[in-house]
């Protein structure tokens, strides 16, 4: 029998996507496959931080056998227990602190990790909506149903000093340090070959398959499978394979970002255990806390503001002089390749797809795509069904996220600028419009396969197929003030069940008090982790 096994893989591009690809594929396929990374010699970069989601460690670092504390120390990492949305309901310029809503409450809400508790076969969100819409409570959804918001307010750690986990969390870190760490791990532990050179062109056979890539120094690097991690340039997928790019600007308007890094006094003001998403005149800004500094960037639409205007608004928010700052200006295309796998080329990361980092899905798209690639891994025959199924999986992953992000803008009550008014004119995709109608009718939207965080975040196959769940939709929709039109009708016939839900809400309040009394500050925990003091 002929040996049709893939024997060699060439990854074009380094960065987080390239080195994640090299590590994951080398680990998954073992020493029988030679993995090479072709990376242009490094240039100086402005480091602005990266935010992630909870399954990163289980799906990627655990798979590689790298302990959490080890990679965190190497990558200047801190914890992220939520995304806090600030000023998404009130008009005005970018502001780092919450304004007051008309009801007197501060204009912020939290998108939290972990699944909602259930009561009598319904998620707690439906009981909260019943109480809220019947005037029985005015407490916000996030603070009624989750224990974390009070920890966030007090800048407390999601782990005890002995490492015990108190709540679901993800991470903030320096993305360039992660890429450097994975490069060392790949070369030293997995025998990945690292070639520093500049790509010039690719060779194709009569079938249109890539046979080799060529470099400025005259190298010819042959392989059986090629992974395109060349970023927005999409060198192999877009230029060599000529795969069409599906523009998604009819759903999401933002197409630019201006970013900078600023100092932060951790001892004086503490370290926030969350990513901040701060609404601006023509988009939004992130704030990613790192040790001794934080990264911030204004993601905006060039239809409604200029690069200079965006930089000025960002600097006003942080009370710094634009003339004294070094900015990283980024133009990005919103959308995805029609297919991420064409013949013997697979695009991973930004070369395949991109949405703005509003929900920290950038790295997730990379390692989720790698998971699906290994699941559908080919041999040299490259049977079309493998690529077809992979392409359907990653397209659905992208489209679901695109729709969820669009709702953040479309359902916001803000209408104080051309940008916010324009967002409301964009149509939802048909499938997502149905989800919005389900929510308006009081129904749960996309129930999770389990509410046990250990099993939910521990079973990536189930999580991948059920990624944005009812908990996510309620955090954002209710947080924006977009409530169901009426409670779930069946609860009107079950008053006893509604009454019996009160102890569940009370248990959330008790657990919150317990955590506040025991959790260390983020600053104290990270000092012990990174400095051993």
Curated annotation (Swiss-Prot):
Protein name: Tryptophan 7-halogenase KtzQ
Role description: Involved in the biosynthesis of kutznerides, actinomycete-derived antifungal and antimicrobial cyclic hexadepsipeptides. Together with KtzR, catalyzes the regiospecific dichlorination of L-tryptophan (L-Trp) to produce 6,7-dichloro-L-tryptophan. KtzQ catalyzes the chlorination of L-Trp at C7 position to yield 7-chlorotryptophan. Can also use 6-chloro-L-tryptophan as substrate and form 6,7-dichloro-L-tryptophan, but has a preference for halogenation at the 7 position of unmodified L-Trp. Cannot use piperazic acid or gamma,delta-dehydropiperazic acid.
Name of encoding gene: ktzQ
Protein keywords: FAD, Flavoprotein, Nucleotide-binding, Oxidoreductase
Catalytic activity: L-tryptophan + FADH2 + chloride + O2 = 7-chloro-L-tryptophan + FAD + 2 H2O
InterPro entries xrefs: FAD/NAD-bd_sf, Flavin-dep_Halogenase_NPB, Flavin_halogenase, Trp_halogen
Family per similarity comment: Belongs to the flavin-dependent halogenase family. Bacterial tryptophan halogenase subfamily.
Taxonomy of the source species: Bacteria, Bacillati, Actinomycetota, Actinomycetes, Pseudonocardiales
Residues that hold L-tryptophan according to the record: 359, 456-457, 463, 467
Enzyme nomenclature, EC number: 1.14.19.9
């Amino acid at each position: 029998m002929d040996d049709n096994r893939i024997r060699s893989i060439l990854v074009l591009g380094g960065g987080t996507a390239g080195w994640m690809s090299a590590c994951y594929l080398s680990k998954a396929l073992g020493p029988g496959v030679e993995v090479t990374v072709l990376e242009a010699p490094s240039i100086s970069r402005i480091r602005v931080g990266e935010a992630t989601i909870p399954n990163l460690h289980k799906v990627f670092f655990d798979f590689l056998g790298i302990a959490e504390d080890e990679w965190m120390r190497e990558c200047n990492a801190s914890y992220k227990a939520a995304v806090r949305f600030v000023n998404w309901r009130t008009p005005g310029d970018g502001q780092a602190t919450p304004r007051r809503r008309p009801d007197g409450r501060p204009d912020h809400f939290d998108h939290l990790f972990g699944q909602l508790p259930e009561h009598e076969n319904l998620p707690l969100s439906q009981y909260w909506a019943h109480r809220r819409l019947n005037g029985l409570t005015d407490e916000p959804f996030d603070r009624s149903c989750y224990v974390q918001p009070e920890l966030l307010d007090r800048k407390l750690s999601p782990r005890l000093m002995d490492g015990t986990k108190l709540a679901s969390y993800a991470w903030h870190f320096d993305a360039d340090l992660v890429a450097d760490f994975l490069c060392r791990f790949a070369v030293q532990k997995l025998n990945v070959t690292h070639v520093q050179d500049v790509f010039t062109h690719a060779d194709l056979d009569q079938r249109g398959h890539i046979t080799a890539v060529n470099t400025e120094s005259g190298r010819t690097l042959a392989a059986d499978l090629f992974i395109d991690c060349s970023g927005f340039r999409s060198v192999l997928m877009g230029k060599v394979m000529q795969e069409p790019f599906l523009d998604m600007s009819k759903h999401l308007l933002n197409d630019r970002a201006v970013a900078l890094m600023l100092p932060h006094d951790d001892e004086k003001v503490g370290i926030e255990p969350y990513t901040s998403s701060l609404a601006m005149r023509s988009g939004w800004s992130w704030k990613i806390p790192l040790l001794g500094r934080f990264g911030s960037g204004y993601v905006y639409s060039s239809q409604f503001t200029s690069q200079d205007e965006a930089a000025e608004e960002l600097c006003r928010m942080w009370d710094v002089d634009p003339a004294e700052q070094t900015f990283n200006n980024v133009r990005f295309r919103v959308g995805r390749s029609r297919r991420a796998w064409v013949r013997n080329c697979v695009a991973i990361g930004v070369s395949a797809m991109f949405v703005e980092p509003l929900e920290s899905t950038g790295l997730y798209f990379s390692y989720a795509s790698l998971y699906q690639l290994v699941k559908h891994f080919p041999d040299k025959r490259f049977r079309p069904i493998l690529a077809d199924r992979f392409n359907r999986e990653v397209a659905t992953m992208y489209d679901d996220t695109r729709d969820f992000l669009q709702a953040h803008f479309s359902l916001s009550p803000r209408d104080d600028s051309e940008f916010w008014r324009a967002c409301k004119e964009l149509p939802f995709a048909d499938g997502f419009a149905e989800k919005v109608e389900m929510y308006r009718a009081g129904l749960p939207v996309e129930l999770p396969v389990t509410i046990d965080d250990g099993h939910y975040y521990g079973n990536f196959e189930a999580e991948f197929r059920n990624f944005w769940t009812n908990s996510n939709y309620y955090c954002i929709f209710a947080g924006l003030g977009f409530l169901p039109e009426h409670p779930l009708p069946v609860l009107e016939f079950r008053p006893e069940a509604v009454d019996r839900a009160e102890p569940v809400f009370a248990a959330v309040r008790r657990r919150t008090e317990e955590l506040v009394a025991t959790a260390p500050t983020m600053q104290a925990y990270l000092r012990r982790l990174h400095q051993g003091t």
